[in-house]
């Protein structure tokens, strides 16, 4: 942010570059839903009052005899202004510059990089990012903020002003009481907002759940003027009690949706929600939502996450990540505890037994919500899985107590339909298992295409055995914790000596034994030629169309995981693969008859192509091409 003009009374500063970009995008992308400006500004006013109430726990003098917190909305037809006022914590000069001139949050660059130019898609992203105060400029061509922070003198107030074009001014001001007035100077085409009925309708639709009273001047019909006229008496236009404290039967779905948009600053409706009052060892109320879209910063370790924490209806903090496990970090909402102390800190949250009980109970409640969605709203669950499936997979390692429940919620691609969409559950797989099959088979790879085309699948396709196709980065980590489902082991088709004995008849078993003996000389010859590169060479039953493949030991890291570790700059052990050959392939017959002079090249070529098929990089591509060309010329 750059300073452009300064004098003793006022200074003009430039908006942070990201703010300029956001203002432009927001005005053009969100205009069709312009009424959210009032929701956002009322939400900010409510937050300011919550913060004052919290700070006043330790500093009661901040209330200065005015403990009745409220929000007021007013309009002036002649001046063409709407004013949103609160008597909350207020802003100092430095806070005004930081909060109204910059976007001080992580993930800003990632947010802008995801914008597409498509108004509808960008509107959703902007909603996820949270437009807050800047939504004022959707309907206003100038915004004035008069604010005095609690604890400061009347002459220490500030006046902030901007037309949203790139700069703002800030100057000292006088203000009788603490709090903030946001004055919107409306654009020429926004006359419909200069109407008490219209403003009340917007407030009741978007902000009825705000726990503070929202007040407007009472209006009566003036027959002489032929219009509603404001009087001196104020009336409360919202219900003014926290939504989560009401009985569920008294809350409409629309009210639940609007509350979600307020606490999450999301532009879209939630996918699902759960509202419960818990009594017993720990007493608390939870209103938790599953969003419809993943936030752009879902994978940002420094991103804000967690739910709002209240204690006995007193706001304590945003983003209380300790109240839910990390794998449920996409959940938004409110938890109101009756047991935690009002002066609770983040450090206390980490150590509190009550918080552990809340976290465990909330995790179970969210999992129940997802189970219900998976069973009764398949389309909604498919949307959830597309957005948050990879995050939920983390729960298999993070939440041992709920691992089995999480496993039932997982979805995968599989050879059953060959589609990339992850729609197959473990229960689906088990329900389709062959007679005599007692294992769940899977393959991991860098991409879905690589997994679907893996040579390790050939025998399974031939026998009609389903294999799960895993290509998410989190899958290998998940599998290190998830070893079985419903008593059936999870087995990689690319690890160890594949044992399909339970699916083979006696004649097939006899043939396999005879083939292994017949090809023993070739196996020994290949083992000698490739002694530096492979741990073992053996005949396999897992191949049908490919001449060879590489596998690793049952307890060794998979090649896919080794590549991920190396790409992340972490140390990875050197693992020699096992080369398995297909005795029925014509190329193996050709190598079996190769002269000693050519055998070394054939052996190296066989290993390199097996590595390439697995997704690995070969050590010397130039040598590979040279060998290939030489052997082709001799063919």
Swiss-Prot record:
CDD domains per record: HATPase_Hsp90-like (cd16927)
Assigned GO CC terms: cytoplasm
Subcellular location: Cytoplasm
B: annotated segments: 347-563
Taxon lineage: Bacteria, Pseudomonadati, Pseudomonadota, Betaproteobacteria, Burkholderiales
Domain of life of the organism encoding this protein: Bacteria
Protein name: Chaperone protein HtpG
Task of the protein: Molecular chaperone. Has ATPase activity.
UniProt xrefs under InterPro entries: HATPase_C_sf (IPR036890), Heat_shock_protein_90_CS (IPR019805), HSP90_C (IPR037196), Hsp90_fam (IPR001404), Hsp90_N (IPR020575), Ribosomal_Su5_D2-typ_SF (IPR020568)
Keywords of this entry: ATP-binding, Chaperone, Cytoplasm, Nucleotide-binding, Stress response
Region called C, residue ranges: 564-635
The species this protein was found in: Bordetella bronchiseptica (strain ATCC BAA-588 / NCTC 13252 / RB50) (Alcaligenes bronchisepticus)
Cited SMART domains: HATPase_c
